[in-house]
Amino acid sequence: DPGAERDGVTEKDLMLSFALSLRDFLVRDGIDVVMTRDSDVFVALENRVAFAHQAEGNLFISLHADVLQQGGAKGATVYTLSDEASDTATEHLAARHNRSDIIAGADLTGSDDQVAGILLDLARQETEPRSVAAAKALTAGMKAAGGPMNRHPIRNAGFSVLKSADIPSVLIEIGFLSSERDLSNLRDPIWRAVMVSAIADSIAKWRDTDAALKPLIRQ
């Protein structure tokens, strides 16, 4: 699955290169990084989330550069899971075969759907503000580095890959291949390096702030 394609540029190759560079920056900042893929392979959505749980991740980031023909989408955008999608996600993710992967390894076998839903809601009460804080840190960092940003740089959507209840999760659209401006930027190694550095710095800042605020969120 090559993802989006435009003028010979494929999303899968572009984002893999971007992710590998971001990993190197983060490692230099003393941050442990686990990649869902580090080569040209396809990883199912549910397996990406499972990798994050197995690694006991503190932040899950999904990188994209899509093609949207309608609306003239352009500029970097960071998504968190929407309230509407969260309700739907709870309904589907509370299914028995997924429960052990959803709530920090907790075994919900024998729990009814109502109990599972309550546990998911409790997990999201802690995770949602942390995801939003990560989105704010990322958009601020990318904007300060020159962006360019979408008119509404923080949005909510029901992306399946963001449905983990217990790990702060964001999806970053670095830009849109359907935008001539974004495509030009995404092809530019200097621009990509600037954005990689900005995102890495933003993650490091979020990590430090999150460590201080997490105990307060749990109260």
Locate each region found by the language model.
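Active-site-proximal helix/loop segments of hydrolytic enzymes
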Residues: 6-219
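Gly-rich Lys/Arg/Thr-decorated short loops/hinges at beta-loop-alpha junctions or inter-strand turns
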Residues: 2-3
